[in-house]
Amino acid sequence: MHHATPTHGTPATGENPQWWQDTQDIPTIVRAIYECISGPAGAPRDWARFRYLQHPDARSLRTVVDPDGSTHAVVFDVDSYIADVTPYFAATGFFEVEIDQRVERFGQVAHVWSRYEARESLETPVIKRGANSIQLCFEHGRWWVFSTVWDNEREGVAFDLW
């Protein structure tokens, strides 16, 4: 995965100006992530845009609850995440919508707690709620997603950090 390096706070030659705008502030990059992964069953996702938001070394971590109640983590790079979710998105509508956000920033580093609800369509009931823990770094005039870790609410696990 190659990313052009912009100069002087403007997109590099040939970069998509809208994608560049997605990376200029924290709420916008988070909204763009949700837009990239949401859509009706079978609809193509904007994986080129999704890749653009991610640092080349970005990782995602999904928590999994096994049938016996034990948990484990599944870690993905960008391409393995896309490969993992594509069959699900082909068969099932998935709309993840942010319902709350908390940003903590120090210098060029930011952490975002982003609470979400997921539905199969925008008109159907919520199928799950949870939280994304997103780590960002500002370099080369833009924000980059370095890691996203998430878990879903379930019996005994409710988001109560604020």
Which residues make up each language-model segment?
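A short, hydrophobic secondary-structure junction motif
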Residues: T28-I29, I33, Y52-V64, S80-P87, ...
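Short, low-complexity N-terminal intrinsically disordered segments enriched in polar/charged residues
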Residues: M1-Y52, P56
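Short, hydrophobic secondary-structure boundary micro-motifs
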Residues: D46, L61-T63, F146
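A short, polar/proline- and glycine-enriched secondary-structure boundary/capping micro-motif
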Residues: T71-A73, L122-V126, R154-W162
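Short, surface-exposed coil-to-beta transition loops
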Residues: E96-I99, I127-S133
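Short beta-strand edge/turn micro-motifs at domain boundaries
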Residues: H2, R129-F159
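Surface-exposed, charged secondary-structure patches
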Residues: R59-E123
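Short beta-strand segments enriched in hydrophobic/aromatic residues
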Residues: I37, Q54, Y116-A118, V149-N152
